[in-house]
Protein backbone atom coordinates (compact mmCIF):
# COMPACT_ATOMS: atom_id res chain seq x y z
CA UNK A 1 0.00 0.00 0.00
CA UNK A 2 3.04 2.24 0.07
CA UNK A 3 2.99 3.32 3.72
CA UNK A 4 6.69 2.71 4.34
CA UNK A 5 8.86 5.55 5.60
CA UNK A 6 10.38 7.78 2.99
CA UNK A 7 14.12 7.44 2.53
CA UNK A 8 15.66 9.75 5.09
CA UNK A 9 17.04 12.98 3.71
CA UNK A 10 20.53 14.02 4.89
CA UNK A 11 19.08 16.70 7.18
CA UNK A 12 16.94 14.08 8.92
CA UNK A 13 19.87 11.75 9.43
CA UNK A 14 21.94 14.57 10.87
CA UNK A 15 19.20 15.64 13.22
CA UNK A 16 18.50 12.12 14.39
CA UNK A 17 22.17 11.75 15.28
CA UNK A 18 22.08 15.05 17.18
CA UNK A 19 19.03 14.02 19.14
CA UNK A 20 19.87 10.37 19.77
CA UNK A 21 18.70 9.50 23.24
CA UNK A 22 17.03 12.86 23.74
CA UNK A 23 13.72 12.77 21.91
CA UNK A 24 10.56 11.37 23.42
CA UNK A 25 11.84 10.97 26.95
CA UNK A 26 8.35 12.00 28.00
CA UNK A 27 6.52 9.91 25.40
CA UNK A 28 8.32 6.61 25.67
CA UNK A 29 7.72 6.16 29.37
CA UNK A 30 3.98 6.23 28.87
CA UNK A 31 1.75 3.46 27.65
CA UNK A 32 -1.89 3.42 26.61
CA UNK A 33 -4.31 2.12 29.20
CA UNK A 34 -5.58 -1.42 28.74
CA UNK A 35 -8.62 -1.22 26.47
CA UNK A 36 -11.84 -1.97 28.37
CA UNK A 37 -13.84 -4.87 26.99
CA UNK A 38 -16.51 -2.39 25.87
CA UNK A 39 -14.12 -0.73 23.41
CA UNK A 40 -14.38 -2.17 19.88
CA UNK A 41 -11.14 -3.75 18.69
CA UNK A 42 -11.21 -1.57 15.57
CA UNK A 43 -11.02 1.61 17.67
CA UNK A 44 -7.64 0.67 19.16
CA UNK A 45 -6.34 -0.73 15.88
CA UNK A 46 -3.15 0.99 14.69
CA UNK A 47 -4.82 1.12 11.27
CA UNK A 48 -7.06 3.93 12.54
CA UNK A 49 -4.14 6.06 13.67
CA UNK A 50 -3.48 8.61 10.94
CA UNK A 51 -0.64 7.97 8.54
CA UNK A 52 0.39 11.43 7.32
CA UNK A 53 -1.40 13.98 9.51
CA UNK A 54 0.54 15.64 12.34
CA UNK A 55 0.38 14.04 15.77
CA UNK A 56 2.77 12.95 18.54
CA UNK A 57 3.31 9.24 19.28
CA UNK A 58 0.96 9.28 22.26
CA UNK A 59 -1.34 11.37 24.42
CA UNK A 60 -3.50 14.45 23.95
CA UNK A 61 -2.82 17.44 21.69
CA UNK A 62 -4.89 20.47 20.84
CA UNK A 63 -4.05 23.96 19.55
CA UNK A 64 -1.11 24.60 17.22
CA UNK A 65 0.98 27.37 18.80
CA UNK A 66 3.70 29.74 17.64
CA UNK A 67 4.57 28.32 14.21
CA UNK A 68 7.66 29.99 12.76
CA UNK A 69 10.61 29.55 10.42
CA UNK A 70 14.11 30.02 11.87
CA UNK A 71 17.60 29.31 10.52
CA UNK A 72 16.49 26.62 8.08
CA UNK A 73 13.83 24.97 10.24
CA UNK A 74 10.09 25.16 10.57
CA UNK A 75 9.03 25.05 14.21
CA UNK A 76 5.64 23.97 15.49
CA UNK A 77 4.65 24.19 19.13
CA UNK A 78 1.40 22.68 20.33
CA UNK A 79 -0.71 22.20 23.43
CA UNK A 80 0.15 18.77 24.79
CA UNK A 81 -0.59 16.59 27.81
CA UNK A 82 2.51 14.47 28.54
CA UNK A 83 0.57 12.33 31.00
CA UNK A 84 -2.47 11.07 29.12
CA UNK A 85 -4.96 11.14 26.26
CA UNK A 86 -7.31 13.72 27.80
CA UNK A 87 -6.88 17.47 28.28
CA UNK A 88 -4.75 18.50 31.28
CA UNK A 89 -1.14 19.07 32.45
CA UNK A 90 -0.67 21.28 29.39
CA UNK A 91 2.81 22.15 28.12
CA UNK A 92 4.09 23.56 24.83
CA UNK A 93 5.41 20.52 22.99
CA UNK A 94 7.84 21.27 20.16
CA UNK A 95 8.54 19.66 16.78
CA UNK A 96 10.77 20.73 13.89
CA UNK A 97 10.77 20.09 10.17
CA UNK A 98 12.37 21.26 6.97
CA UNK A 99 9.32 20.62 4.81
CA UNK A 100 6.24 20.86 7.11
CA UNK A 101 5.51 17.18 6.37
CA UNK A 102 8.32 15.18 8.04
CA UNK A 103 8.52 16.06 11.75
CA UNK A 104 10.91 15.33 14.61
CA UNK A 105 9.86 15.93 18.21
CA UNK A 106 12.10 17.81 20.64
CA UNK A 107 11.65 18.28 24.36
CA UNK A 108 8.73 20.51 25.41
CA UNK A 109 9.69 24.17 25.02
CA UNK A 110 7.50 25.83 27.64
CA UNK A 111 6.33 24.23 30.88
CA UNK A 112 4.73 25.66 34.05
CA UNK A 113 7.72 26.80 36.11
CA UNK A 114 7.26 30.49 37.03
CA UNK A 115 4.58 32.12 39.21
CA UNK A 116 2.71 33.58 36.24
CA UNK A 117 2.24 30.21 34.51
CA UNK A 118 2.48 27.75 37.40
CA UNK A 119 -1.02 26.39 36.76
CA UNK A 120 -0.85 26.17 32.98
CA UNK A 121 0.86 27.30 29.79
CA UNK A 122 -1.91 27.93 27.29
CA UNK A 123 -1.93 29.08 23.69
CA UNK A 124 0.00 31.90 22.07
CA UNK A 125 2.04 32.98 19.09
CA UNK A 126 5.56 33.69 17.88
CA UNK A 127 6.95 36.97 16.54
CA UNK A 128 10.28 37.49 14.77
CA UNK A 129 11.96 40.62 16.15
CA UNK A 130 13.99 43.04 13.95
CA UNK A 131 17.28 41.36 14.88
CA UNK A 132 15.88 38.01 13.76
CA UNK A 133 15.31 36.64 17.27
CA UNK A 134 11.97 34.90 17.84
CA UNK A 135 9.81 35.75 20.83
CA UNK A 136 6.85 33.79 22.14
CA UNK A 137 3.83 35.43 23.73
CA UNK A 138 1.56 32.98 25.55
CA UNK A 139 -1.17 32.76 28.16
CA UNK A 140 -0.26 31.64 31.66
CA UNK A 141 -2.58 30.52 34.45
CA UNK A 142 -1.33 31.95 37.73
CA UNK A 143 -4.01 30.97 40.24
CA UNK A 144 -5.41 27.56 41.11
CA UNK A 145 -8.93 26.41 40.30
CA UNK A 146 -10.24 29.60 38.63
CA UNK A 147 -8.10 29.78 35.45
CA UNK A 148 -6.99 33.36 36.10
CA UNK A 149 -5.22 34.32 32.87
CA UNK A 150 -2.21 36.56 32.19
CA UNK A 151 0.10 37.00 29.21
CA UNK A 152 3.77 36.00 29.34
CA UNK A 153 6.80 36.18 27.10
CA UNK A 154 9.68 33.79 26.44
CA UNK A 155 12.90 34.03 24.41
CA UNK A 156 15.40 31.44 23.15
CA UNK A 157 18.15 30.68 25.63
CA UNK A 158 20.59 30.33 22.75
CA UNK A 159 19.58 32.22 19.61
CA UNK A 160 22.40 30.55 17.67
CA UNK A 161 20.69 27.17 18.06
CA UNK A 162 18.58 26.63 14.92
CA UNK A 163 16.48 24.07 16.77
CA UNK A 164 15.56 26.54 19.56
CA UNK A 165 15.66 23.74 22.11
CA UNK A 166 15.63 25.88 25.26
CA UNK A 167 13.52 28.91 26.17
CA UNK A 168 13.81 31.35 29.07
CA UNK A 169 11.18 33.52 30.72
CA UNK A 170 12.23 37.00 31.87
CA UNK A 171 11.67 37.99 35.48
CA UNK A 172 9.37 40.83 34.39
CA UNK A 173 6.60 38.38 33.42
CA UNK A 174 3.66 38.69 33.14
CA UNK A 175 3.64 41.40 30.46
CA UNK A 176 -0.15 41.87 30.36
CA UNK A 177 -2.68 41.29 33.11
CA UNK A 178 -6.46 41.73 33.29
CA UNK A 179 -7.49 45.15 34.58
CA UNK A 180 -10.45 45.93 36.83
CA UNK A 181 -13.67 45.29 34.95
CA UNK A 182 -12.12 42.70 32.63
CA UNK A 183 -13.05 39.03 32.80
CA UNK A 184 -9.81 37.44 33.96
CA UNK A 185 -11.01 33.94 33.10
CA UNK A 186 -11.70 34.93 29.48
CA UNK A 187 -8.47 36.70 28.53
CA UNK A 188 -6.13 34.60 26.44
CA UNK A 189 -4.25 33.57 23.31
CA UNK A 190 -2.05 36.53 22.23
CA UNK A 191 -1.44 36.91 18.50
CA UNK A 192 1.70 37.39 16.48
CA UNK A 193 2.66 41.03 17.00
CA UNK A 194 3.04 43.53 14.16
CA UNK A 195 5.17 46.68 14.03
CA UNK A 196 4.29 50.14 12.74
CA UNK A 197 4.92 53.76 13.74
CA UNK A 198 7.40 52.86 16.45
CA UNK A 199 5.03 50.50 18.25
CA UNK A 200 4.44 46.79 18.43
CA UNK A 201 0.82 45.71 18.57
CA UNK A 202 -0.80 42.44 19.54
CA UNK A 203 -4.32 41.15 20.13
CA UNK A 204 -5.64 39.09 23.03
CA UNK A 205 -9.00 37.33 22.90
CA UNK A 206 -11.63 38.20 25.47
CA UNK A 207 -15.24 38.34 26.58
CA UNK A 208 -17.10 41.37 27.91
CA UNK A 209 -20.31 40.71 29.77
CA UNK A 210 -22.15 37.58 28.77
CA UNK A 211 -21.98 37.88 24.99
CA UNK A 212 -19.48 40.37 23.56
CA UNK A 213 -16.43 38.70 22.13
CA UNK A 214 -13.53 41.04 21.49
CA UNK A 215 -9.95 41.36 20.38
CA UNK A 216 -8.14 43.48 22.98
CA UNK A 217 -5.43 45.63 21.40
CA UNK A 218 -2.10 46.09 23.22
CA UNK A 219 0.86 48.34 22.28
CA UNK A 220 4.54 48.29 23.23
CA UNK A 221 7.63 50.26 22.22
CA UNK A 222 10.12 47.69 23.51
CA UNK A 223 8.25 44.35 23.37
CA UNK A 224 8.49 44.33 27.15
CA UNK A 225 5.99 46.83 28.53
CA UNK A 226 2.53 46.41 27.01
CA UNK A 227 -0.35 48.87 27.43
CA UNK A 228 -3.95 48.16 26.50
CA UNK A 229 -5.58 50.53 24.01
CA UNK A 230 -8.79 52.29 25.08
CA UNK A 231 -10.88 50.26 22.67
CA UNK A 232 -10.54 46.77 21.16
CA UNK A 233 -9.54 46.32 17.56
CA UNK A 234 -12.97 44.80 16.98
CA UNK A 235 -15.83 43.17 18.89
CA UNK A 236 -19.22 41.56 18.29
CA UNK A 237 -22.05 39.93 20.22
CA UNK A 238 -20.93 36.39 19.44
CA UNK A 239 -19.51 35.00 22.67
CA UNK A 240 -15.88 34.54 23.73
CA UNK A 241 -13.17 34.96 21.08
CA UNK A 242 -10.41 32.40 21.50
CA UNK A 243 -7.19 32.17 19.49
CA UNK A 244 -7.58 35.42 17.52
CA UNK A 245 -5.48 35.84 14.39
CA UNK A 246 -4.91 38.99 12.33
CA UNK A 247 -2.90 39.25 9.14
CA UNK A 248 -2.58 41.25 5.90
CA UNK A 249 -3.49 39.97 2.44
CA UNK A 250 -2.12 40.46 -1.03
CA UNK A 251 -4.42 41.76 -3.78
CA UNK A 252 -7.26 39.42 -4.80
CA UNK A 253 -6.04 36.37 -6.66
CA UNK A 254 -2.36 36.76 -5.75
CA UNK A 255 -1.17 33.63 -3.97
CA UNK A 256 1.88 35.13 -2.26
CA UNK A 257 1.58 35.94 1.42
CA UNK A 258 2.68 38.96 3.45
CA UNK A 259 4.63 39.23 6.67
CA UNK A 260 2.36 40.30 9.52
CA UNK A 261 3.99 43.75 9.78
CA UNK A 262 3.62 44.59 6.07
CA UNK A 263 0.79 47.10 5.55
CA UNK A 264 -2.01 46.18 3.18
CA UNK A 265 -5.42 47.35 2.00
CA UNK A 266 -7.07 44.09 3.11
CA UNK A 267 -6.81 42.06 6.31
CA UNK A 268 -8.27 38.94 7.85
CA UNK A 269 -9.52 38.89 11.43
CA UNK A 270 -10.23 35.39 12.66
CA UNK A 271 -11.44 34.06 15.98
CA UNK A 272 -12.23 30.65 17.37
CA UNK A 273 -15.70 30.90 18.84
CA UNK A 274 -15.84 29.19 22.21
CA UNK A 275 -19.62 28.69 21.98
CA UNK A 276 -19.59 26.70 18.74
CA UNK A 277 -16.00 25.39 18.59
CA UNK A 278 -15.65 26.63 15.01
CA UNK A 279 -13.18 29.08 13.44
CA UNK A 280 -14.72 32.16 11.82
CA UNK A 281 -13.13 34.96 9.83
CA UNK A 282 -13.96 38.16 8.02
CA UNK A 283 -12.10 40.09 5.32
CA UNK A 284 -11.94 43.81 5.93
CA UNK A 285 -10.05 47.06 6.35
CA UNK A 286 -7.67 48.01 9.15
CA UNK A 287 -7.75 51.74 9.87
CA UNK A 288 -4.29 52.45 11.24
CA UNK A 289 -5.28 55.90 12.51
CA UNK A 290 -8.29 54.88 14.57
CA UNK A 291 -6.81 51.41 15.15
CA UNK A 292 -10.05 49.69 14.32
CA UNK A 293 -10.89 46.83 12.01
CA UNK A 294 -14.04 47.04 9.86
CA UNK A 295 -15.34 43.95 7.99
CA UNK A 296 -16.19 44.52 4.32
CA UNK A 297 -19.54 42.81 4.89
CA UNK A 298 -21.49 44.75 7.55
CA UNK A 299 -23.23 41.52 8.57
CA UNK A 300 -20.00 39.56 8.47
CA UNK A 301 -19.65 39.26 12.24
CA UNK A 302 -22.89 37.30 12.43
CA UNK A 303 -22.95 35.52 9.05
CA UNK A 304 -19.27 34.83 8.95
CA UNK A 305 -17.12 32.69 6.77
CA UNK A 306 -15.35 29.69 8.22
CA UNK A 307 -11.91 28.37 7.41
CA UNK A 308 -13.34 24.88 7.53
CA UNK A 309 -16.95 23.75 7.85
CA UNK A 310 -16.02 20.59 9.72
CA UNK A 311 -13.93 19.53 12.70
CA UNK A 312 -11.30 22.29 12.69
CA UNK A 313 -10.53 24.68 15.56
CA UNK A 314 -7.98 26.89 17.32
CA UNK A 315 -6.14 27.61 14.08
CA UNK A 316 -3.03 29.70 13.63
CA UNK A 317 -1.36 31.17 10.55
CA UNK A 318 2.22 32.25 9.98
CA UNK A 319 4.19 33.83 7.16
CA UNK A 320 6.68 31.49 5.50
CA UNK A 321 9.61 33.65 4.33
CA UNK A 322 11.09 30.81 2.28
CA UNK A 323 8.22 30.45 -0.18
CA UNK A 324 6.54 33.79 0.54
CA UNK A 325 3.21 32.27 1.52
CA UNK A 326 0.84 32.34 4.46
CA UNK A 327 0.25 28.93 6.00
CA UNK A 328 -2.75 27.88 8.06
CA UNK A 329 -2.59 25.20 10.77
CA UNK A 330 -5.55 23.85 12.72
CA UNK A 331 -6.55 21.25 15.30
CA UNK A 332 -9.04 18.42 14.74
CA UNK A 333 -10.27 16.74 17.91
CA UNK A 334 -11.52 13.17 18.09
CA UNK A 335 -15.18 12.33 17.46
CA UNK A 336 -15.16 9.20 19.58
CA UNK A 337 -15.51 8.96 23.37
CA UNK A 338 -13.08 9.72 26.18
CA UNK A 339 -13.15 6.02 27.04
CA UNK A 340 -12.04 5.21 23.51
CA UNK A 341 -9.30 7.85 23.61
CA UNK A 342 -7.89 6.46 26.84
CA UNK A 343 -7.92 2.99 25.33
CA UNK A 344 -6.09 4.21 22.22
CA UNK A 345 -3.62 6.21 24.27
CA UNK A 346 -3.85 9.25 22.00
CA UNK A 347 -6.27 12.00 20.99
CA UNK A 348 -6.14 14.89 18.53
CA UNK A 349 -4.41 15.60 15.23
CA UNK A 350 -3.58 18.66 13.17
CA UNK A 351 -4.93 19.35 9.72
CA UNK A 352 -2.57 19.24 6.76
CA UNK A 353 -0.89 22.69 6.52
CA UNK A 354 -2.73 24.86 4.00
CA UNK A 355 -1.63 27.79 1.90
CA UNK A 356 -4.20 30.61 2.10
CA UNK A 357 -4.76 33.62 -0.13
CA UNK A 358 -7.53 36.01 -1.16
CA UNK A 359 -9.97 34.74 -3.78
CA UNK A 360 -10.12 36.79 -7.03
CA UNK A 361 -13.55 38.01 -5.92
CA UNK A 362 -11.97 39.59 -2.83
CA UNK A 363 -14.77 38.15 -0.69
CA UNK A 364 -13.19 35.06 0.85
CA UNK A 365 -10.00 33.07 1.26
CA UNK A 366 -8.90 30.14 -0.84
CA UNK A 367 -7.10 27.25 0.84
CA UNK A 368 -5.02 24.44 -0.59
CA UNK A 369 -2.75 21.76 0.91
CA UNK A 370 0.87 22.86 0.79
CA UNK A 371 2.75 21.57 -2.24
CA UNK A 372 5.20 19.59 -0.09
CA UNK A 373 2.44 17.08 0.62
CA UNK A 374 2.73 15.83 -2.95
CA UNK A 375 6.13 14.30 -2.09
CA UNK A 376 4.21 11.58 -0.27
CA UNK A 377 2.32 10.51 -3.37
CA UNK A 378 3.05 6.98 -4.50
CA UNK A 379 1.23 4.53 -6.74
CA UNK A 380 -1.54 6.19 -8.76
CA UNK A 381 -4.51 5.44 -10.99
CA UNK A 382 -6.39 7.70 -13.40
CA UNK A 383 -9.93 7.68 -14.76
CA UNK A 384 -11.19 9.94 -17.56
CA UNK A 385 -14.48 10.52 -19.38
CA UNK A 386 -16.42 7.96 -17.35
CA UNK A 387 -20.20 8.52 -17.15
CA UNK A 388 -21.99 7.53 -13.95
CA UNK A 389 -25.71 7.13 -14.53
CA UNK A 390 -28.40 8.17 -12.02
CA UNK A 391 -28.53 5.79 -9.08
CA UNK A 392 -25.22 4.16 -9.97
CA UNK A 393 -21.71 4.23 -8.52
CA UNK A 394 -18.26 3.54 -9.93
CA UNK A 395 -15.43 1.94 -7.97
CA UNK A 396 -11.90 3.30 -8.29
CA UNK A 397 -9.61 0.27 -8.22
CA UNK A 398 -5.93 -0.48 -8.64
CA UNK A 399 -4.59 1.08 -5.44
CA UNK A 400 -5.08 1.17 -1.69
CA UNK A 401 -7.43 3.99 -0.69
CA UNK A 402 -7.38 4.08 3.11
CA UNK A 403 -4.38 6.45 2.96
CA UNK A 404 -4.77 8.39 -0.27
CA UNK A 405 -5.01 11.72 -2.08
CA UNK A 406 -7.83 12.01 -4.61
CA UNK A 407 -8.40 14.82 -7.11
CA UNK A 408 -11.48 14.68 -9.33
CA UNK A 409 -13.14 16.99 -11.85
CA UNK A 410 -16.83 16.24 -12.30
CA UNK A 411 -19.41 17.44 -14.79
CA UNK A 412 -23.20 17.28 -14.56
CA UNK A 413 -25.17 17.44 -17.79
CA UNK A 414 -28.67 18.10 -16.45
CA UNK A 415 -28.76 21.03 -14.05
CA UNK A 416 -32.43 21.47 -14.90
CA UNK A 417 -33.00 18.43 -12.68
CA UNK A 418 -31.86 20.39 -9.63
CA UNK A 419 -34.33 20.81 -6.79
CA UNK A 420 -35.64 24.13 -5.54
CA UNK A 421 -34.00 25.28 -2.32
CA UNK A 422 -36.47 25.30 0.56
CA UNK A 423 -36.29 28.83 2.03
CA UNK A 424 -37.00 27.34 5.45
CA UNK A 425 -33.34 26.31 5.60
CA UNK A 426 -32.16 29.88 5.01
CA UNK A 427 -28.36 29.89 5.00
CA UNK A 428 -28.05 26.95 7.41
CA UNK A 429 -25.91 24.61 5.31
CA UNK A 430 -25.42 22.12 8.12
CA UNK A 431 -29.14 21.68 8.74
CA UNK A 432 -29.76 21.40 5.00
CA UNK A 433 -27.15 18.67 4.69
CA UNK A 434 -28.68 16.85 7.65
CA UNK A 435 -32.05 16.83 5.89
CA UNK A 436 -30.60 16.13 2.44
CA UNK A 437 -27.86 13.64 3.18
CA UNK A 438 -25.96 11.65 0.60
CA UNK A 439 -28.52 8.84 0.49
CA UNK A 440 -31.46 11.15 -0.22
CA UNK A 441 -32.04 10.56 -3.91
CA UNK A 442 -33.30 13.00 -6.50
CA UNK A 443 -32.26 16.30 -8.00
CA UNK A 444 -28.53 16.74 -8.59
CA UNK A 445 -26.35 15.04 -5.98
CA UNK A 446 -22.97 13.39 -6.60
CA UNK A 447 -19.53 12.90 -5.08
CA UNK A 448 -17.25 10.36 -3.42
CA UNK A 449 -17.79 7.51 -1.03
CA UNK A 450 -14.50 7.13 0.84
CA UNK A 451 -13.41 4.61 3.47
CA UNK A 452 -16.26 2.42 2.22
CA UNK A 453 -16.68 -1.29 2.91
CA UNK A 454 -17.17 -3.70 0.01
CA UNK A 455 -20.87 -4.05 0.73
CA UNK A 456 -21.30 -0.32 1.52
CA UNK A 457 -22.37 -1.07 5.08
CA UNK A 458 -19.83 1.63 5.98
CA UNK A 459 -19.08 4.69 3.89
CA UNK A 460 -18.27 8.36 4.35
CA UNK A 461 -19.79 10.58 1.67
CA UNK A 462 -18.12 13.77 0.43
CA UNK A 463 -20.49 15.29 -2.09
CA UNK A 464 -22.19 18.22 -3.76
CA UNK A 465 -25.93 18.90 -4.00
CA UNK A 466 -27.05 21.54 -6.48
CA UNK A 467 -30.23 23.61 -6.12
CA UNK A 468 -32.04 25.78 -8.63
CA UNK A 469 -31.15 29.49 -8.74
CA UNK A 470 -33.05 31.55 -6.20
CA UNK A 471 -34.12 34.17 -8.77
CA UNK A 472 -33.85 35.28 -12.38
CA UNK A 473 -30.23 35.69 -13.40
CA UNK A 474 -28.93 34.07 -10.21
CA UNK A 475 -26.50 31.18 -10.30
CA UNK A 476 -27.34 27.69 -9.01
CA UNK A 477 -26.76 27.14 -5.30
CA UNK A 478 -24.06 24.57 -4.53
CA UNK A 479 -23.96 22.77 -1.19
CA UNK A 480 -20.87 20.77 -0.20
CA UNK A 481 -21.30 18.13 2.50
CA UNK A 482 -19.41 15.47 4.36
CA UNK A 483 -21.88 12.87 5.62
CA UNK A 484 -20.31 10.35 8.05
CA UNK A 485 -23.60 9.03 9.42
CA UNK A 486 -22.82 5.61 7.91
CA UNK A 487 -19.05 5.81 8.39
CA UNK A 488 -18.89 3.15 11.09
CA UNK A 489 -20.85 0.35 12.73
CA UNK A 490 -19.03 1.02 16.02
CA UNK A 491 -21.19 2.47 18.82
CA UNK A 492 -20.71 5.68 20.82
CA UNK A 493 -19.37 7.82 18.00
CA UNK A 494 -20.22 11.44 17.21
CA UNK A 495 -21.13 11.44 13.51
CA UNK A 496 -22.48 14.87 12.55
CA UNK A 497 -22.97 15.99 8.98
CA UNK A 498 -20.79 18.97 8.08
CA UNK A 499 -21.60 21.36 5.26
CA UNK A 500 -20.93 24.73 3.66
CA UNK A 501 -22.19 26.54 0.60
CA UNK A 502 -19.72 26.89 -2.27
CA UNK A 503 -19.54 30.35 -3.84
CA UNK A 504 -18.95 29.10 -7.38
CA UNK A 505 -20.81 29.27 -10.67
CA UNK A 506 -21.68 25.74 -11.71
CA UNK A 507 -23.77 26.88 -14.68
CA UNK A 508 -21.28 25.09 -16.94
CA UNK A 509 -21.90 21.91 -14.95
CA UNK A 510 -18.25 21.62 -13.86
CA UNK A 511 -16.84 21.41 -10.35
CA UNK A 512 -13.73 19.93 -8.68
CA UNK A 513 -13.08 18.10 -5.44
CA UNK A 514 -9.94 17.00 -3.62
CA UNK A 515 -10.08 14.64 -0.65
CA UNK A 516 -7.18 13.67 1.62
CA UNK A 517 -8.09 10.28 3.07
CA UNK A 518 -6.05 9.20 6.07
CA UNK A 519 -7.49 6.24 7.98
CA UNK A 520 -9.61 8.17 10.51
CA UNK A 521 -9.75 11.60 8.90
CA UNK A 522 -11.17 12.88 5.62
CA UNK A 523 -10.06 16.40 4.67
CA UNK A 524 -11.75 17.81 1.55
CA UNK A 525 -11.42 20.90 -0.63
CA UNK A 526 -14.26 21.90 -2.95
CA UNK A 527 -14.01 24.06 -6.07
CA UNK A 528 -10.30 24.72 -5.76
CA UNK A 529 -10.38 25.43 -2.02
CA UNK A 530 -13.43 27.69 -1.77
CA UNK A 531 -15.07 25.38 0.77
CA UNK A 532 -13.15 22.99 3.04
CA UNK A 533 -14.47 20.26 5.34
CA UNK A 534 -12.50 18.03 7.73
CA UNK A 535 -14.26 15.10 9.38
CA UNK A 536 -13.09 12.39 11.81
CA UNK A 537 -14.42 8.89 11.15
CA UNK A 538 -13.71 5.48 12.69
CA UNK A 539 -14.61 2.59 10.36
CA UNK A 540 -14.92 -0.88 11.85
CA UNK A 541 -14.95 -2.71 8.50
CA UNK A 542 -13.46 -0.31 5.94
CA UNK A 543 -9.97 -0.46 7.43
CA UNK A 544 -6.66 -1.00 5.63
CA UNK A 545 -7.02 -2.91 2.38
CA UNK A 546 -10.73 -3.37 3.10
CA UNK A 547 -11.37 0.33 2.46
CA UNK A 548 -12.74 1.22 -0.96
CA UNK A 549 -13.32 4.37 -3.02
CA UNK A 550 -16.32 5.13 -5.23
CA UNK A 551 -17.77 7.95 -7.29
CA UNK A 552 -21.54 7.95 -6.75
CA UNK A 553 -24.53 9.60 -8.39
CA UNK A 554 -27.75 9.67 -6.38
CA UNK A 555 -29.36 12.32 -8.56
CA UNK A 556 -31.49 12.30 -11.71
CA UNK A 557 -28.89 13.56 -14.21
CA UNK A 558 -25.80 11.91 -15.68
CA UNK A 559 -22.48 12.70 -14.02
CA UNK A 560 -19.23 12.53 -15.97
CA UNK A 561 -15.89 11.94 -14.33
CA UNK A 562 -13.95 14.31 -16.57
CA UNK A 563 -10.75 13.31 -14.84
CA UNK A 564 -9.89 11.57 -11.60
CA UNK A 565 -6.44 10.81 -10.26
CA UNK A 566 -5.80 9.05 -6.97
CA UNK A 567 -2.51 8.36 -5.24
CA UNK A 568 -1.53 6.10 -2.39
CA UNK A 569 0.18 8.23 0.26
CA UNK A 570 3.44 7.20 1.92
CA UNK A 571 4.03 7.68 5.61
CA UNK A 572 6.33 10.58 6.52
CA UNK A 573 8.58 10.81 9.54
CA UNK A 574 6.11 11.71 12.30
CA UNK A 575 7.61 12.60 15.65
CA UNK A 576 9.11 9.15 16.14
CA UNK A 577 5.80 7.26 15.91
Swiss-Prot record:
GO molecular function: beta-fructofuranosidase activity
Predominant location: secreted
Cited PROSITE patterns: GLYCOSYL_HYDROL_F32 (PS00609)
Signal peptide, first to last residue: 1-22
EC code: 3.2.1.26
InterPro entries in UniProt: ConA-like_dom_sf, Fructan_Metab_Enzymes, Glyco_hydro_32, Glyco_hydro_32_AS, Glyco_hydro_32_C, Glyco_hydro_32_N, Glyco_hydro_beta-prop_sf
Keywords: Apoplast, Cell wall, Glycoprotein, Glycosidase, Hydrolase, Secreted, Signal
Source organism, top-level taxon: Eukaryota
Record Pfam families: Glyco_hydro_32C, Glyco_hydro_32N
Localization (cell): Secreted, Extracellular space, Apoplast; Secreted, Cell wall
Family: Belongs to the glycosyl hydrolase 32 family.
Protein name: Beta-fructofuranosidase, insoluble isoenzyme 1
Amino acid sequence: MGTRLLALAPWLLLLLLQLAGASHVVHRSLEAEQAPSSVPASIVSPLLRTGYHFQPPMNWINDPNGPLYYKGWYHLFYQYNPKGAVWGNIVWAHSVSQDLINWIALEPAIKPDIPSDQYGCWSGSATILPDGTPAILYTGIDRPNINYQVQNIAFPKNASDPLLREWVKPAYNPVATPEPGMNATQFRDPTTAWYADGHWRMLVGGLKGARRGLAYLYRSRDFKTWVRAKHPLHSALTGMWECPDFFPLQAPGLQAGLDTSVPSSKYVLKNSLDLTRYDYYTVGIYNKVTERYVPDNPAGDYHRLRYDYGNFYASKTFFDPVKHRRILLGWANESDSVTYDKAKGWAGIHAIPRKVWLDPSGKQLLQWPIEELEKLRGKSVSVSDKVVKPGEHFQVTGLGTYQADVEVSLEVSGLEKAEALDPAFGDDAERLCGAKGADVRGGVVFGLWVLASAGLEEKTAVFFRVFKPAGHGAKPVVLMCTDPTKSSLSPDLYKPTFAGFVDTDISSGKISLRSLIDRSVVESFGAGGKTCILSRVYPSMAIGDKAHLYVFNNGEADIKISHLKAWEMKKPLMNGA
